[in-house]
Every structure is written in C-alpha cells, then in structure tokens.
Amino acid sequence: MSVKTKEKEMAVTILYEQDVDPKVIQGLKVGIIGYGSQGHAHALNLMDSGVDVRVGLREGSSSWKTAEEAGLKVTDMDTAAEEADVIMVLVPDEIQPKVYQEHIAAHLKAGNTLAFAHGFNIHYGYIVPPEDVNVIMCAPKGPGHIVRRQFTEGSGVPDLACVQQDATGNAWDIVLSYCWGVGGARSGIIKATFAEETEEDLFGEQAVLCGGLVELVKAGFETLTEAGYPPELAYFECYHEMKMIVDLMYESGIHFMNYSISNTAEYGEYYAGPKVINEQSREAMKEILKRIQDGSFAQEFVDDCNNGHKRLLEQREAINTHPIETTGAQIRSMFSWIKKED
C-alpha cells in the first residue's frame, strides 16, 4: 500500500506486517553467507522468526564458534549454498564475486533465490546469475548491530525490498517475507529497484553521510586550530556537538532543530550554510552522482581492491592519525557514558 501524508501521497510503496505472509520464508531453507555486521543480524533475526537458517563460513573462520554459540547451524559455504532455497550473500562487496564463483554458482538450482543486502555487484554486472533463479535484495537501512538490537526490543529497522529477476513468479512474496523475518515489516518495507538502492546508497555515503560529513568536520576543526584556537575546544564545537544536532533533526526534523537552538545559531545557519555548501559544492555532488551512475566509481573501487587496497589503506591511515582523532580520543576518555573500545 502507498502511505499518505497530510499533504500528498508518497511516491514509494511502504508495506507492513499485515501486508506480507510470514509463512513464505518460514517454508524455505535460508543460507546466510558471512557472519559480519549484517550477517549475524539476518541470521539471528530469521532464526528467532522461526526460519530454517544456516550460516555458511570459510573453514577456520573466527566467526564459526561465535555463530554456533548463538544457536545457529554453521557449515562451510558450499554446503550452505547447496542446502538453501534462499542464499543471502553478506560478505563484503569486493569479495562477493569470488565467493559467488567459488562457493555458490555451482550449487544454484532452478527456482532458487539469490539474495543481497546491497546491489553493487548485481547492478554493475560483477555477478551475473543464471536466468532461472530469483535475484532479490533486502537492505536494512541501518548497521547490523542496530538491526539486531531493534529486533530484540520488539521494533525493527526499515528495509528496502528489490527484485531484479523473478524466475519463479513469486520473488516479491519471498523478499517481502524475508524482510518480515529480519524485522523490517515492523517499521516499514519500502519497494525499490536495484539501481535505486545502489546509486542512492553510494551517493549518500560519499556526498553526505561519510565523505561529506567527515570532510566538513575536518575542515571546521582545521580552520579553528590553524587560527590558534585550542584543539580541544575545536573538537567540541565541530565534532562533539554534531550528534546532538543530528539527533534533533532525526527525531523531529530541521524545523525542530531550529526551534531548539538559539536565534543566533539559527540566523548563522541561514547566513553561513550556503557559503559552505555553495554552487561549487552542488556541482561536485552532481559529478559524484554521475560517476556512480556510469560505473566509474565502481571500477575505481574494484581496481583498488585488486591492487591490495592501496589507496583505501593510505587514506585510512591518514584519517586515523589526523589531529581530530587523537584529540577526540583524549576527550572521549573523559566521558564515563561512552563505552570504551577493547
């Protein structure tokens, strides 16, 4: 069903528990390939939803014992793929093609369902399944630990549901039921396409959530410290307080955030915001989106993976040693409510 607001009907279709049939996924064997952030959440939530699930891992995986202790059936990847009707691939994007070719492809049977939580490899053609299998996606809009936590607390994280290939005629029934199994139907399942999920997800990560946000925070911190302000104060102003502002926006929108801050801060938002995110920034965003759409970014990422992640590791080291990180570690050690890393 479509969801209506007071102003207009939303362009997307959102489905809830009453709109899906749990018996579909409960009547199928599911193989979860991988037991990382999303893998553990999918496997445990499905198991708790009464689904026959097994986890496929490489021999000697450090996650093998962890999954078994959680009550899951654990096998090697080939066995999981051979036994399953629905094979959910939840290893990292860059190794999915290799895992698919070496452990999954030979075990696919007509009528099986190949599933993903991100459309990267299907959309860009790095994995090309046979025509006689379903290809679906259940993409929770949150990290795995949140997907699991929300499920155990009785709620759920919204899911995107997509069908790329419907070989059996009931691929939509399967993906919607799968989303129910991981808790998505509790908060809403949004119908989308593989192209929409892949391109919008990558753009959001690069231009706003990860790339844009990190560079904005770094630039603010560097501007203040280069002007002679103490790094500790710069950290508080440009980094620490960010969560509080985002929480207000997340809970009730930008208007509520503006209601909650001072008039001085709100006026500064309107004055300075367009100077920081200006037409040049918007043109850069358009170029980022274009490179995502035409596959240039995907190929660059794959090339770097094939080169031993050279660029990724260099950039990771640079941010890990940036003054904002060393300052942040010192500041956060003062906060008793922040859980310390082991």
From Swiss-Prot:
Its cofactor is Mg(2+). Residues 12-192 form the KARI N-terminal Rossmann domain. NADP(+) binds at Y35, G36, S37, Q38, R58, S61, S63, D93, E94, I95, Q96, G144. Gene3D superfamilies: 6.10.240.10, NAD(P)-binding Rossmann-like Domain (3.40.50.720). Its EC number is 1.1.1.86. PROSITE patterns: KARI_C, KARI_N. The keyword Glycoprotein does not apply. This is Ketol-acid reductoisomerase (NADP(+)). It comes from Slackia exigua (strain ATCC 700122 / DSM 15923 / CIP 105133 / JCM 11022 / KCTC 5966 / S-7). The gene is ilvC.
